[in-house]
């Protein structure tokens, strides 16, 4: 019983992977990273629908065995190297684990690369973001 209590205490003390942002904190951080202001509402919409603004999310396995990582749910078959060592084109040149941290710099840079090569439709949730977008006007 003591061992169980110790294990529970250790599990609770262990730092959680990632963090949860909100629309405004995401918009401000992305703006500070140089993302054009006219894109910020779209990125906020995508992050809301892909991960609920959570940086530590690994999505369920896709039909082809790949997974999606981080706040923008970036796919490990094309864009990042999975921890399993499975083949990846790794177009962003980074480990998928880099997309799960509190620092969103890698996620933002990789997402911008996805956008430049495939457009907004690279995200399956884009149809939620093609009309009304969340306002970021009060965020700055």
Curated annotation (Swiss-Prot):
The active site is at residues 50, 68. Residues 1-18 form the signal peptide. Its EC number is 3.2.1.17. GO terms for molecular function: lysozyme activity. The keyword Cytoplasm does not apply. Residues 19-140 form the C-type lysozyme domain. CDD domains: LYZ_C_invert. It catalyses: Hydrolysis of (1->4)-beta-linkages between N-acetylmuramic acid and N-acetyl-D-glucosamine residues in a peptidoglycan and between N-acetyl-D-glucosamine residues in chitodextrins. The keyword Heme does not apply. InterPro entries: Glyco_hydro_22, Glyco_hydro_22_CS, Glyco_hydro_22_lys, Lysozyme-like_dom_sf. SUPFAM superfamilies: Lysozyme-like. It is an enzyme of class 3 (hydrolase). Found in the midgut. PANTHER family: GEO02684P1-RELATED, LYSOZYME C. Unlikely to play an active role in the humoral immune defense. May have a function in the digestion of bacteria in the food. Belongs to the glycosyl hydrolase 22 family. This is Lysozyme E. It comes from Drosophila melanogaster (Fruit fly). The lineage of its organism: Eukaryota, Metazoa, Ecdysozoa, Arthropoda, Hexapoda.
